Curated annotation (Swiss-Prot):
Disulphide-bonded residues: 64-70, 68-77, 322-355
Propeptide: 17-37
Leader sequence segment: 1-16
Subcellular locations according to the entry: Secreted, Extracellular space, Extracellular matrix
Native source organism of the sequence: Ovis aries
Glycosylated residue positions: 42, 48, 271, 312
LRR repeats: 83-103, 104-127, 128-151, 152-172, 173-196, 197-221, 222-242, 243-266, 267-290, 291-313, 314-343, 344-369
The name this protein goes by in its record: Biglycan
Keyword Zinc listed: no
Tissue note: Found in several connective tissues, especially in articular cartilages.
PANTHER family in the cross-refs: AGAP008170-PA, BIGLYCAN
Post-translational modifications reported in the UniProt record: The two attached glycosaminoglycan chains can be either chondroitin sulfate or dermatan sulfate.
Length: 369
């Protein structure tokens, strides 16, 4: 457990670069998931970082739940075997950490009076029931981490101020239309590790959202879901059962710059599919069943990283990665992985990688027979 003085000190340093875990927020996640900068929030008026503590009322230092650690406006009640949300939480609390307990239900008045709460951590409890008004008092809540619980549905009536929702590793099978209604500031949703199938997403389930980041990994998807927010910059669908990428699958995601499709069963990527991703910088297709390098990579002028290791690729053509000729303007690759494929790497022509910054950026080897 982090010392409380360290938690408080790191609170001020939590404005990390986009999609990188930094300092304070590391303690809330144990699965290496990337963290979003508050400046990525789609509603500029919502925040530019951690709330201004000086603008809040004086701290109620005498109020601290039994067994918890309270300092500044951080209340840490993790790893205490709690069965319910504790009482006597200071009304000026901005971060409440309740992870690693035995809480099974969130009741109507559990968070009453916590109108300044910015982040709520409920990871790794036994929550299966949430009152429809449980989050009503949390008018300034921006980060809700409720992963690794027993939820079978996305909680109703989430605060309209919410920017980031981590709800992975639950038992959710359905995302109904309207469940995210009114969440115009939502920027990041992590919902992997749920038994979601393609049929579990109702048409219009993501209507109104302007997400930057979405992860639905380790689910039961057999294809790229339709009608995801077209504002996405990052989409991670790794560890699913996707078998093919068809022409129309990526049509609406022209703003993507990172696409994760590793650890699926992809055998075919239809020609022209990748042409809808003009801003793509990073493509993960490792651990699939591809027999050739996908067509269209040379036309992605911003693409810099391609993971193709652990597939069934038998041949790499001289124009598979780079445009024909040397005068075509494009970003240089700084990472291409092709190891663990049945391609004789000694037969690949050196000119194949003429648009790579450094030969060390090319990962061959581990020849797979």
């Amino acid at each position: 457990m982090c010392p409380l003085w360290l938690l408080a000190a790191l609170l001020a340093l939590s404005q990390a670069l986009p999609f990188e875990q930094k300092a304070f927020w590391d303690f809330t996640l144990d699965d290496g998931l990337p963290m979003l900068n508050d400046e990525e929030a789609s509603g500029a008026e919502t925040t530019s970082g951690i709330p201004d503590l000086d603008s809040l009322p004086p701290t109620y230092s005498a109020m601290c739940p039994f067994g918890c650690h309270c300092h500044l406006r951080v209340v840490q009640c993790s790893d205490l075997g709690l069965k319910a949300v504790p009482k006597e939480i200071s009304p000026d609390t901005t971060l409440l950490d309740l992870q690693n307990n035995d809480i099974s239900e969130l009741r109507k008045d559990d968070f009453k009076g916590l109108q300044h709460l910015y982040a709520l951590v409920l990871v790794n409890n036994k929550i299966s029931k949430i009152h429809e008004k449980a989050f009503s008092p949390l008018r300034k809540l921006q980060k809700l981490y409720i992963s690794k619980n027993h939820l079978v549905e996305i909680p109703p009536n989430l605060p309209s101020s919410l920017v980031e929702l981590r709800i992975h590793d639950n038992r959710i099978r359905k995302v109904p239309k309207g469940v995210f209604s009114g969440l115009r500031n939502m920027n990041c949703i992590e919902m992997g590790g749920n038994p979601l199938e393609n049929s579990g997403f109702e048409p219009g389930a993501f209507d109104g959202l302007k997400l930057n980041y979405l992860r639905i990994s380790e689910a039961k998807l057999t294809g790229i879901p339709k009608d995801l927010p077209e504002t996405l910059n990052e989409l991670h669908l790794d560890h699913n059962k996707i078998q093919a990428i068809e022409l129309e699958d990526l049509l609406r995601y022209s703003k993507l710059y990172r696409l994760g499709l590793g650890h699926n069963q992809i055998r075919m990527i239809e020609n022209g599919s990748l042409s809808f991703l003009p801003t793509l910088r990073e493509l993960h297709l490792d651990n699939n069943k591809l027999s050739r390098v996908p067509a269209g990579l040379p036309d992605l002028k911003l693409l810099q990283v391609v993971y193709l290791h652990t597939n069934n690729i038998t041949k790499v053509g001289v124009n598979d990665f780079c445009p024909v000729g040397f005068g075509v303007k494009r970003a240089y690759y700084n990472g291409i992985s092709l190891f663990n494929n049945p391609v004789p790497y000694w037969e690949v022509q050196p000119a194949t990688f003429r648009c790579v910054t450094d030969r060390l950026a090319i990962q061959f080897g581990n020849y797979k027979k």
